[in-house]
């Protein structure tokens, strides 16, 4: 039966020990494993004893990795499991580590959801749908997601969302209805709900300077006209130019007037 002949502190990690059986290095263990099994020099160990020691120390390795991983920021169960799997910790050990983390409140999904909610509302321009999506991706329970997504809706101020929308609006150019449409699409992409978006848009003023709009119309007209001038006959070219400008949100009468002003059309052309 193998006998412990030496237990020494590891040089690179003072919290772990090298265990020698019959003068041969057997394995490394941490102090908790050493104490739990009351290991000491001269002690004889059966194969079953060694199996238990190895199993427990593997769990301890996983636990220490999890604690270190959790020390940087809050994590969900899913995140911890994925991390330990990458670290090649066994499924049995992972299960025991997760149980410990819940017991010691190292993993707390309600606390996680609350913290993420506060951070996102305070530091991002994202709406409740993005928050909800993040919680799903992180493996949070559906009932917790439902509760905290509703809190997100309640606590995100409408004035703050209006500021987000106005910031978006400043980056968009073109006719009023098109800018409004672009702002709406951006807010949808940022995770805001239609009821909120409509409330925000109703509070905004999309009126633009007529001179600026006229310059934009002239620029877009020239761009579309020159792009297509070699592809179509004059009548078809005018029709395509009108269609392209209307897709950009310009009004038909404004387009016709600009075409006449530019000498491209005489006012009799219609969309084919």
UniProtKB/Swiss-Prot annotation:
Family annotation (NCBIfam families): PRK14135.1 (NF010733)
Name this polypeptide is given: Regulatory protein RecX
Signal peptide: none
Alphabetical list of PANTHER family matching this protein: REGULATORY PROTEIN RECX FAMILY PROTEIN
Organism phylogeny: Bacteria, Bacillati, Bacillota, Bacilli, Bacillales
Keyword Cytoplasm: yes
Family the UniProt entry places it in: Belongs to the RecX family.
Alphabetical list of InterPro entries matching this protein: RecX_HTH_1st, RecX_HTH_3rd, Regulatory_RecX, WH-like_DNA-bd_sf
Transmembrane segments: none
Main location: cytoplasm
Keyword Coiled coil: no
Localization per Swiss-Prot or TrEMBL: Cytoplasm
Role description: Modulates RecA activity.
Key words of the record: Cytoplasm
Gene3D superfamilies from the UniProt entry: Winged helix-like DNA-binding domain superfamily/Winged helix DNA-binding domain
Any one Gene Ontology BP term: regulation of DNA repair
GO cellular component: cytoplasm
